[in-house]
Amino acid sequence: MRNYEWVNVFRFIFFIFFALSVSLISITAVDAAGSKEADTHDHGHSSHHGIDGAKLPLWTIIPFAGILLSIAVFPLVAEHFWHQNYGKVSLAWIVIFSIPFLIGYRGDAWYEIVHIVLLDYVPFIVLLSALFTAAGGICLKGSLRGSPAVNTIIIAIGTSLASWMGTTGAAMLLIRPLLRANAWRKHKVHVVVFFIFLVANIGGSLTPLGDPPLFLGFLKGVEFFWTLKLFPVMLPVSILLLIVFFVFDTLMFKKEGAAPDDGEKQPLKLDGALNFVFIACIIGAILFSKSLADGAFKDETVAEKMAPKIQKAEGEMAAAKDKLSAYVSSNSGASLDQSNAEYYQLRTDHLHAVAAVNGLRAKKTHDENLGVDIFGVRVPYANLVRDGLMILIGIVSLIYTPMYRTVKDDHGHVVPEENAAETNLRAANGFTWEPILEVAKLFIGIFICMIPALKILQAGVDGKLSNVVLAVQSSTNDPINTMYFWLTGILSSFLDNAPTYVVFFNTAGGDPTSLMGPMSQTLLAISCGAVFMGANTYIGNAPNFMVKAIAEENGVKMPSFFGYMAWSIPILVPVFILVTLLYF
């Protein structure tokens, strides 16, 4: 099918989805209007504003499924159309979702969209852009031949660095040298795939700097170095995958012809090394903003005011748990499912009590963070300082290692001017803005369209995905760590892994002291699931997509969305099953 024909097909699909969305969301909103309790819901799902996920029907996640399917299918069936129009496709799904959503839920819908853009998407893309810019100004020059040993060493170094400079920083630093080292090889897709597995995901397990889910845990009170407890899991997983990679790369290497003669061997050297300092400054900005949030930009009176309410709610939560446990222990022969009304009521009472405590904790965090209200959303001053510093650092990096002049080639691609690589470090490094632009355009659609899925999950036992919440709990609502690991991981593969982590963190009680203490295995399961299984898909973690885009820029024919999963499932799932048997 020609490009213009695909445009017409897409327009038809767009209008069909738009019409259906307007009708269905409007009907649902009218249905819910009579019993709207979003601001005063006594289960604590909504701490201040926004939509109660318990009232959202499951079909509202269709636009989210639509944008994921677009990412998966269009590159397969309409590759040229996709590369020319992926930003428009993302925008189309935003419109399909947002306009009916706003018509149906009005102010609450507006709040949710602005909230996820200002507090999730903007920090997300600012951090990625800053790391992308700084790392793109570091160029490893010299003779580097992509043998199995060299490739394994590069991936191992990246895996080690990822926890300390972030998965994005480590991936952006090393992907270009790795691609240049293997440019002469025909069989190199697997090199990039394993790089995504290890450097862009699993390597970021050991500190809150490594991956966004762990940083959110840090913001919720998990100690900075607690995440080192993931080391006994991360190390054997990394070693096992490196061994598998080395064996596979050795087999592929034997299929290659003789390596080309590059002439006189050049010693390795790093240009633009000052950008390492800029990357360190980005990490420093993150930690500095946390100290500001805990100090100068914190209203200390809020904790004192909220303490009695939180203590009362925690007492009610403990009492509800005791009642549930007592019933289960004294009714061992009873059916412990929804068919037993008394049992199910006790179980949901406890889960509602947990949600109420989490709601009060969220309200406390919201109220004590001093900030500026933008369209009704409180943006903490600490966030503004952090993002402002990172933007400034990115600008300084561009001043130190400036961009080159570009031209368009015969295919419309932006490329460096002729001979630019000889005089410009970023040109020599193959640096372009296209990978970060692709992530920015696609992920704004993903973030906005996933609002219903996140709200339904946050609604817990009252939401249409209540079975997910119940699946991680035993009959007495004690955690089932195996299920926490797998469900956090599976959802993190398709949703943003940071809010998914928070959903299950709160489902497990949301108390960092308890989760670092007697429930440490549960927190370990949630953390491993969120970080490790981000490697399952291209959208599981943002660096995955950026690495894919850079590889394609360098002539590597990367697998499609489903093609990538054809690698990740047979390689990673057996490893995760082994992790389950050994640790959870």
Predicted regions and their residues:
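Juxtamembrane and boundary regions of transmembrane helices in multi-pass small-molecule transporters
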Residues: 187, 206, 216, 225-270, ...
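Flexible interhelical linker loops that connect adjacent transmembrane helices
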Residues: 249-274, 412-413, 420-433
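Cytoplasmic-side transmembrane-helix entry/capping segments in multi-pass membrane proteins
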Residues: 83-94, 118, 122, 144-156, ...
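Hydrophobic mid-bilayer segments of alpha-helices in multi-pass membrane transport proteins
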Residues: 60-71, 85-100, 121-130, 271-281, ...
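Alpha-helical transmembrane segments
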Residues: 116-128, 226-244, 373-392, 484-487, ...
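Transmembrane alpha-helix boundary signature
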Residues: 29-33, 79-80, 98-120, 132-147, ...
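Membrane-interfacial helix-loop connectors
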Residues: 100-101, 162, 173-187, 191-193, ...
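Transmembrane helical segments that form the transport core of multi-pass membrane transport proteins
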Residues: 279-503
